[in-house]
Regions:
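Phosphate-binding and adjacent anionic-ligand microenvironments
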Residues: 288, 292-294, 314, 334-519, ...
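Short acidic, glycine/serine/threonine-rich loops at helix termini
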Residues: 97-102, 127-131, 149-155, 176, ...
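Conserved phosphate/anionic-ligand binding catalytic regions in large, soluble enzymes, centered on
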Residues: 39-59, 143-144, 232-244, 300, ...
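An N-terminal, well-structured beta->alpha segment
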Residues: 5-103, 193, 198-226, 236
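N-terminal small/polar loop signature for handling phosphorylated ligands or for N-terminal nucleophile
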Residues: 87-150, 247-307
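Gly/Ser/Thr-enriched, mixed-charge loops and adjacent short helices
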Residues: 10, 14, 18, 34-43, ...
Length: 558
């Protein structure tokens, strides 16, 4: 069916008033390009579930697309013989609460018991609920840190991890077999509540989650003097983060007022990503005013955390790699000192995260495992340890994109856990007369200076994906002989699978002091290049990264 015919069918069948008005406003001639974009395909379902712009159309996030995806998920659970139970959470985004309720209605109509949080909650609380109720799956309605125009639908497996590629393919096939209008079962929300096929998640589940997070503490010293500014970026983090901080005695917490309450329009930060300085500008201003020891920011679904700390009269943003290394060192040091370090401890990070983690782990005798990008792979490593009866060996996991987890209580990155650890670590260093900036600099002095940079090369146009594939093919066929003036001594191609990792379209180049990893984004025509350099000073490391970037840009024709 053509995009135009699909548009006409939707115009005739859609009952939702807002979506119908949106479709009715389109003119088949004047808006032909927009109709094509809305209806030329179904919104893609992958390991991250669904994610797209809100609006009417098969290539948009709306109630009909969500219902159809849920019909496919219910069919998959039955076909796979998994428990017919599914936990549901949602964030502060436009439409999230409704999408969550519609997900519950479709599941219940298909004989799958839906456990629905009664209010917005962080994504890690969804991972927890999946495990708490023994569910076959979980759904979190969120688009993470995308702009306000987006929403999404993340699917989790029975282990509390985001689903694998194989599972995503299987669910996608079931989704494809369901018609948006005639192929979806739906029941009344109130009726399903009455008969128990929709269950509202109680406070016992959330309190148990917070108990599990609190048990990740490794220092019981006084934290009351720590001054914290916190912004949930108008997302889900406020309740859980402030509760967990109060539990451990961090009471001097000032919320950024413009960003304290849930608001899916994100009026003060169009791109609510705590990795970006722009999203934290309001928090930085308040931190300067209150002379805070620490600024924390969590993204709308509260699975990523950014931080800024006093340094030289202003505030310094810590990168995801720096926070990961600081927390790894802190956990190793404290657990070694208090006698809780497990035998044969394991830390996990990704192939694109800093090599400094290897140096820190080796210093403490910790096995460091590396996975492909995506926290689900870190969660899978925890699962492997758990199946071997060795879950206690897991110490910490992080990825350079601001995701952290210090326990096996959930299987996704957890900014509630990260906020607890970061505040505790800051208080511990404060008691020794040090800031986190000074602590990071001390680690650089001890282990050497590591510089990490990310370059994204956008390849627009219909042939963008093909051009990206051609670039990687050419790099594999003839990799550069030198980078940053150093000889390339190692080329690792993950396409055939390396180090027991699944096959992945990733190429790694190494010299004596430089590492470059090249991979496609997977969801858009964008090539990602991760640069890492190790040197005696940060200036030298930065120069090496810059030189490697120039070399690769020249190779790519940038």
């Amino acid at each position: 069916m053509t995009a135009l015919n699909t548009y006409r069918r939707w115009l005739a069948r859609v009952e939702d008033d807002a979506l119908r008005a949106e479709l009715s406003a389109l003119d088949e001639v004047r808006d032909a390009a927009q109709i094509e974009d809305r209806f030329y395909r179904d919104l893609a379902f992958g390991t991250g579930g669904l994610r797209g712009v809100l609006g009417a159309g098969t290539n948009r996030m709306n109630v009909y697309v969500v219902r159809r995806a849920t019909q496919g998920l219910a069919a998959y659970l039955k076909a796979a013989g998994l428990p017919l139970r599914c936990a549901i959470a949602y964030d502060s985004r436009i439409g999230s609460a409704r999408f969550a309720r519609e997900t519950a209605r479709v599941l219940a109509a298909n004989g799958v018991t839906a456990y629905l949080y009664p209010r917005l909650e962080p994504t890690p609380a969804l991972s927890w609920a999946v495990r708490y109720y023994g569910c076959g799956a979980g759904v979190c309605v969120t688009a993470s840190h995308n702009p306000a125009a987006y929403n999404g639908y993340k699917v989790y497996g029975p282990d509390g991890c985001q689903i694998t590629l194989e599972t995503a393919d299987a669910v996608s096939k079931h989704i494809g077999a369901a018609d948006h209008f005639d192929g979806v079962r739906l029941c009344g929300f109130a009726d399903a509540l009455a008969d128990g096929t929709i269950c509202m998640i109680g406070e016992d589940c959330l309190e148990a989650f917070l108990d599990a997070v609190e048990r990740r503490s490794v220092w019981d010293g006084d934290r009351s003097a720590l001054r914290v500014v916190y912004t949930p970026l108008n997302g889900t983090g406020r309740e859980c983060v402030t509760k967990i901080l109060r539990r451990i005695g961090v009471t001097d917490v000032t919320l950024v007022p413009e960003q304290a309450w849930p608001d899916g329009s994100f009026p003060t930060c169009p791109y609510p990503n705590p990795e970006e300085r722009a999203a934290l500008e309001h928090g930085l201003a308040l931190a300067r005013e209150t002379r805070a020891d620490l600024l924390l920011g969590t993204d709308p679904d509260c699975d990523r955390m950014g931080a800024a700390v006093p340094d030289g009269g202003d505030y310094r943003l810590l990168t995801g790699n720096e926070m990961g290394v600081l927390l790894l060192d802190y956990l190793c040091r404290r657990r070694s000192e208090n006698g809780t370090m497990p035998a044969r401890p394991v830390a996990v990070t990704t192939i694109v995260s800093t090599d400094m983690a290897d140096a820190v782990a080796a210093h403490y005798g910790v096995e460091l495992r590396r996975t492909l990008t995506g926290f689900k792979f870190i969660g899978e490593q925890i699962g492997e340890l758990e199946r071997a009866g060795e879950a206690e060996r897991y110490l910490f996991g992080f990825e350079e994109s601001y995701g952290y987890l210090s326990g096996p209580h959930v299987r996704d990155k957890d900014a509630v856990n990260a906020a607890l650890l970061c505040c505790e670590m800051a208080a511990w260093y404060r008691a020794q007369g040090m800031t986190l900036a000074q602590a990071m600099d001390a680690l650089y002095e001890k282990f050497g200076y590591y510089r990490n940079e990310l370059q994204s090369v956008v390849l627009p146009g219909e042939d963008g994906m093909e051009r990206m594939s051609a670039i990687l093919t050419a790099l594999r066929a003839a990799p550069p002989h030198t980078l940053a003036g150093e000889r390339v001594t190692r080329v690792r191609d993950y396409l055939g699978g390396l180090d027991s990792l699944p096959a992945s379209d990733v190429l790694e180049l190494r010299t004596a002091h430089v590492k470059v990893i090249v991979r496609p984004s997977g969801t858009e025509p964008k090539l990602k290049l991760y640069y890492s350099a190790h040197a005696r000073t940060m200036a030298e490391a930065a120069a090496l990264c810059a030189a490697a970037r120039r070399d690769m840009s020249a190779r790519l024709g940038e």
